[in-house]
Amino acid sequence: MCSSDLLVGDVALESDVSLMEELDDIHHPEGCIREAEKLAAEVYGSDRCFLGVNGTTGVIHGMLLGALRPGDRILVPRNSHRSVLGGLILAGLEPVYVQPAYEEEWRLTLQLSPEQVEAAFARYPDLKAVFLTTPNYFGLAADTKRIAAIAHEHGAVLLVDEAHGPHLGFSDLLPPGAMECGADAAAQSTHKIVGAMTQCSLLQVRYGRLRPEAMEQAMSLVTTTSPNYLLMGALDGARAQLAEKGAAMAAASVRAATVLRKALHRVPGLPVLEKELNGRGGVVALDPGKVTIQVSRLGITGPEAADALRRAGIAVELVDQDHVLFLVTYADDNPEFPAIAQRIATVLEKMRKPRRDLPPVPPVLSIPEQVLTPREAFFAPKERVPFREAAGRVAGETLSFYPPGIPLIMPGERLTKELIAFSLQLQEKRLQVSGPRDPSLQTFEVLV
């Protein structure tokens, strides 16, 4: 057991206050919360900002609920975060999925391109929204400005998952932010990169195409009636820090990232992602604070590299079978960081093995027939059946493999013999299974 005084000090405990008139009401803000929202909206150039205390998952749910109506069609990249599926279920939306491009040399999923968005509107002119995740976890940014213009030309709104971009737009060293590029709403994980506490997020909204009362009602619906004032205070503090020092923080982050990149480039045979993917698969820019290395080219896996680095006192941001991702922030711009960067490079160089043949990247199958919406599939009765015998049944859960990490099947879609056979082939090649409750694929959940 760990006592509270070992976790937080007296000031933090005293700040964990109950609801009082002086502290405003997050559901009907008129005082200090309203002022915090107003200041955050000014910083990001939005018409309204909502404080999120249930992470960006809650903010994405509120964004989808407030922007659209049940039955509306929305264009969704196939590799969107799991919170988007939750929002589709809650809001009763009909997704039109699109496969983002996949870069085989780097073994990375790229972005949704303007051309894909245009093609989607040509086929589905009744689309009410485009959902875009930019930048993605690896810092690859989409052409948000062009996609916003296309959506608006067709009378639709652009909703952005900007979880990995709350710091964008404060410096020319970084890609522009979603609101600057014309998005109608953007969900930002203020806790991921800038200085707010875990669980802190913001929803930026531009009115005109979105109704104020609908967004307010939706955010109230997904927000607790007992919000933690430490979290809301942390959001306001992060906003103030960005307003005062955003450009300097960006410059510090880029300096530190450059130090790390130089050290990693000295490791023979180790690819370090720079700007070579710009102009491919809808990617127009890279967040320089995200440093991605392809360790599979050293004959090792991502988890092997991450374990070795952890033993050396280095925690990484993200790992998959091929890559290790380092998140470099302004806090890393210090005299000790060059030695840390060199330690990382030394660990990796010592791990080099004779290069192994990488498992082939599986071809992308066509998106299966959508029989039911995600909401209909969620509430439908289900049963578990042998996966090999599930052809013709409607999926009750998601199935994907890494690489490339794009779902082969989503809830409400029909399983086919081709898809099942393909999945079993990928499993035999020991690609990582993700999604189903039974990762062995002996059984799979389907609708009754």
Each PLM stretch: what is its role?
Residues 1-3:
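Short, small-residue-biased leader/transition segments that mark boundaries at the very start
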Residues 7, 43-46, 56-276:
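Conserved PLP-enzyme active-site core in the AAT-like
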Residues 13-56:
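Conserved N-terminal alpha-helix of the aminotransferase class I/II PLP-enzyme fold
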Residues 212-216, 234-243, 284-289, 318-324, ...:
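Short acidic (Asp/Glu) and glycine-rich catalytic loops that position anionic groups and cofactors
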Residues 293-300:
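Short, surface-exposed ligand-recognition loops at beta-strand->loop->(often short) alpha-helix junctions
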Residues 300, 304, 308-312, 317-448:
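PLP-dependent enzyme catalytic core of the Aspartate aminotransferase-like
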